[in-house]
Structure formats: structure tokens, C-alpha cells
Amino acid sequence: MRIHAIPVLSDNYVWLIEGDQGHCAVVDPGEDAPVLAEIERRNLTLMAILLTHHHADHCQGVAGLRARFPVPVYGPALEAKTWVTHPLADLETFDLPHIGRFQAWHTPGHTLGHISLISNGAAFVGDTLFSAGCGRLFKGSPEQMLASLDRLSSLPDATMIYCGHEYTADSLRFAHFAEPNNESIVQRIREVNEARAAGLPSVPTSMSMEKQINPFLRIREPSLRAAILKHAGSESLSDADAFWTLRCWKDEFDDLPLLPRHAQNH
């Protein structure tokens, strides 16, 4: 299984999964034309489309792809809207011949139905986990997102993480602000700046790397927790409240409008 990044829209990535005998699948096609061009350039045949969630920038290329390749579309059962032909429940597995076996993990938070797709040492995580960051909580609760991030953290350290956007440099700026003495973040900033200057993606990343640099996976680290408490003006916070404080802190840092805190959804 060979995985290629296809940049689309302003900062999205479509992941092209190349298997044997010219078979391929794509994850989260936000556009069709660049994906079709890359499939043709590599002389491949599209066998399936995989979706992590329903946002348009991850699925608005489905129609154009299916007009050329009438293939099945695998996606979250809780968001099985227009395009999903094969809804996936939590822990459901499916096989794509000559490509691989995939398992769906329900990872809500960014959306209520969001899934991540796990296969052969790779995790396609959509907008749940970014390198040095995580998705905004448009529908899910802090409890849900933290549980999703903890679940992804249980993957082996060598797992490669394929996220949906090129957000790494911006995320690292906040990570360094929150943890100024974290040398792993400083080194990663250098590496990402070099990669981006060369026109290369900053992702995939590894779970091992994310545990060192991603503040949203590190809320229980004493030094970061102290910074979160100081920012909140509090002596004690639950893990979910600490996560939410950190998420809002990053939104303030990025000058983004604050989202409401949603109640736990079951």
C-alpha cells in the first residue's frame, strides 16, 4: 500500500491509496479534477472512495469521481447522507481487493459521526487529529473529542497519521506558545518550515511524533497542564475542561470566533 498526497482547495489533502494491479482508493475527495488527473497520471483504476465525515471540503468531489468511476463510497453510518453507499459502524471492517483491509473507528468531536479509518499501520483521521493540533468542535462535546484523541493515541507509536489539512505550521506556532520549553516542538518547526519551503507536505506524521509535539494529546503533562490552569485562572480542572480551555485558547490565539461548548451527546 503506497499513499500519495493530492493537494486540493486551499489547504486540504486527498489521500490516494495505491494498491497492487493498478487498483486505488481515495480518502476525502474535496475536489474531483485534481484527483482524476493524478489517477490518470499514475495509470490507476479507482476502486473505492472513503469518507471520514460529511463536510463539503471532504466530499464535494465524490460526484465527479463517480461519474468516471461508479465505485462504492464508504463513510460514517451516522452521517450516511447523499453519497455513502456503504455506511460504517464503529469497529466495522471491510476489504478492498489488492489495496487492503480497513477498520472504522468512531471518532466524534469535530462532527458527531466522524470516523477514522485504520489500515496496515496507517490512520486516516480526517479533521479529528492534525499534526500539532486537532479539529474544532462544530457539533461534538469536549468529552467526545478528548475520548477520540485518547483513542487514537492508543495506536502504536509507529502508526502514520494522515490528516485532512495542511495546518501544521500554524498549529506549531500555538504549540510553541503553550509549551515554549518543549524542544521537540522547536525542532519540528524547523523541519516543517524546510518541508514547506521545498513545496512538500508536512504530513503524514507519526503517532510517536504527535505525542511529543501535539498539545491536545499532552493535556495531562504537568508543565502544559500548569499553563492551561494559569490561562483559565483556575486551581483545578477536569481533563475535559482542560482540553476545552486549550481548544478555546488556540481559537483566541488564531483570532477565530469561539464556538459554543456542546453538551455530551450519546
Which stretches of residues belong to each language-model region?
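Divalent metal-coordination and catalytic microenvironments
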Residues: 17, 28, 53, 65, ...
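Accessory terminal helices/loops
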Residues: 150-160, 169-266
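Core dinuclear metal-dependent hydrolase active-site scaffold
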Residues: 16-18, 93-118, 123, 154
